[in-house]
């Protein structure tokens, strides 16, 4: 229903306009207070690059963070990551992740980033506190924030916005009548716009999410996704249809698709209830980090990697490297 409202296919968005005006007024006032110096942003001792979005959920932001961290690591740069940790509830904050940290504590995306990159990761609603905890735990040369474009309490040196190239900005209204956290005009003020799928517009960097081999959660076995049989596909991400469309492009038509809420907690019994005898389960990598502790032999996940268009991607990296060197 919310997708229909935000896409303009339902007139219910009109009823939500008063709340959207209030949201826009408050968010605009907060940003203006930092611009006018009425509030002071905390500046980290190392450069900060924000990877965020203008809309709520499902734009491909986390794969961009993973790509950026890996690119920096390949160039000998120690990158750290801070995140809000949506979906997690830790005993205390800030929380610096380690090998024993669970998605229930830190959230699924921070755990995914930590496992994929090995980079130090800290979570807190207060990003400045997360950075300070990270600096006390490791020696990063640069901080990448997973989300946080609207968290103006943390000063930043570069801003990168990830846009869903197919859905773009829906009906263009602020939350909750539309998907917008800020107006689309904000794109003119950021350092780079990365467009996930669809058609990149002038000045934007085109990106595709390329699937790898399906990975078994228990054994680590890898195989082409189209060799799996009798598959139930499960996606608890911001925009599940993108995952299901990816499977179709890979030559796999699931017997059933299951869309879950983004960051939804998962229990073994609930997941098993999705399957009938003889069926296999295929999920996103973000869901896999929540299911690994109780995975069964016939559970698989499909990792994706961000591929950015050249030469724009190299230029973006060069611009970021100038902050460090």
UniProtKB/Swiss-Prot annotation:
<dbReference type="GO" id="GO:0009244">
    <property type="term" value="P:lipopolysaccharide core region biosynthetic process"/>
</dbReference>
<dbReference type="GO" id="GO:0009029">
    <property type="term" value="F:tetraacyldisaccharide 4'-kinase activity"/>
</dbReference>
<dbReference type="Pfam" id="PF02606">
    <property type="entry name" value="LpxK"/>
</dbReference>
<keyword id="KW-0443">Lipid metabolism</keyword>
<keyword id="KW-0067">ATP-binding</keyword>
<keyword id="KW-0808">Transferase</keyword>
<feature type="binding site">
    <location>
        <begin position="55"/>
        <end position="62"/>
    </location>
    <ligand>
        <name>ATP</name>
    </ligand>
</feature>
<keyword id="KW-0418">Kinase</keyword>
<keyword id="KW-0441">Lipid A biosynthesis</keyword>
<keyword id="KW-0444">Lipid biosynthesis</keyword>
<protein>
    <recommendedName>
        <fullName>Tetraacyldisaccharide 4'-kinase</fullName>
        <ecNumber>2.7.1.130</ecNumber>
    </recommendedName>
</protein>
<dbReference type="InterPro" id="IPR003758">
    <property type="entry name" value="LpxK"/>
</dbReference>
<comment type="similarity">
    <text>Belongs to the LpxK family.</text>
</comment>
<comment type="function">
    <text>Transfers the gamma-phosphate of ATP to the 4'-position of a tetraacyldisaccharide 1-phosphate intermediate (termed DS-1-P) to form tetraacyldisaccharide 1,4'-bis-phosphate (lipid IVA).</text>
</comment>
<dbReference type="GO" id="GO:0009245">
    <property type="term" value="P:lipid A biosynthetic process"/>
</dbReference>
<keyword id="KW-0547">Nucleotide-binding</keyword>
<dbReference type="GO" id="GO:0005524">
    <property type="term" value="F:ATP binding"/>
</dbReference>
<dbReference type="InterPro" id="IPR027417">
    <property type="entry name" value="P-loop_NTPase"/>
</dbReference>
<comment type="pathway">
    <text>Glycolipid biosynthesis; lipid IV(A) biosynthesis; lipid IV(A) from (3R)-3-hydroxytetradecanoyl-[acyl-carrier-protein] and UDP-N-acetyl-alpha-D-glucosamine: step 6/6.</text>
</comment>
<dbReference type="GO" id="GO:0005886">
    <property type="term" value="C:plasma membrane"/>
</dbReference>
């Amino acid at each position: 229903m919310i997708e229909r409202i935000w896409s303009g296919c339902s007139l219910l968005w009109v009823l939500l306009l008063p709340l959207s005006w209030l949201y826009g007024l408050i968010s605009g006032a907060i940003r203006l207070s930092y611009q006018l110096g009425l509030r002071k942003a905390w500046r980290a001792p190392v450069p900060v690059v924000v990877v965020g979005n203008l809309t709520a959920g499902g734009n491909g932001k986390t794969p961009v963070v993973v790509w950026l961290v890996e690119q920096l690591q390949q160039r000998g740069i120690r990158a750290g990551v801070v995140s809000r940790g949506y979906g997690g509830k830790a005993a205390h904050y800030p929380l610096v992740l380690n090998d024993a940290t669970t998605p229930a504590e830190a959230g699924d995306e921070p755990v995914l980033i930590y496992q994929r990159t090995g980079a130090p990761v800290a979570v807190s609603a207060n990003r400045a506190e997360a950075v300070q905890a990270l600096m006390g735990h490791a020696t990063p040369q640069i901080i990448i924030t997973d989300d946080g474009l609207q968290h103006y309490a943390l000063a930043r040196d570069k801003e990168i916005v990830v846009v869903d190239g197919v859905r773009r900005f829906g009906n263009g209204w602020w939350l909750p009548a539309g998907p917008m956290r800020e107006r689309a005009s904000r794109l003119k003020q950021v350092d780079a716009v990365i467009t996930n799928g669809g058609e990149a517009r002038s000045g934007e960097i085109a990106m595709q999410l390329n699937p790898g081999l399906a990975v078994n959660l228990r054994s680590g076995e890898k195989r082409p996704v189209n060799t799996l049989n009798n598959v139930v596909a499960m996606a608890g991400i911001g925009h599940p249809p993108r995952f299901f469309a990816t499977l179709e492009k890979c030559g796999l038509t699931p017997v059933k698709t299951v869309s879950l809420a983004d960051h939804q907690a998962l229990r073994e019994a609930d997941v098993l209830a999705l399957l009938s005898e003889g069926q296999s389960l295929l999920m996103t990598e973000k869901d896999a980090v929540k299911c690994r502790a109780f995975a069964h032999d016939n559970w698989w996940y499909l990792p994706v990697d961000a591929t950015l268009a050249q030469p724009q991607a190299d230029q973006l990296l060069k611009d970021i490297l100038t902050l460090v060197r």
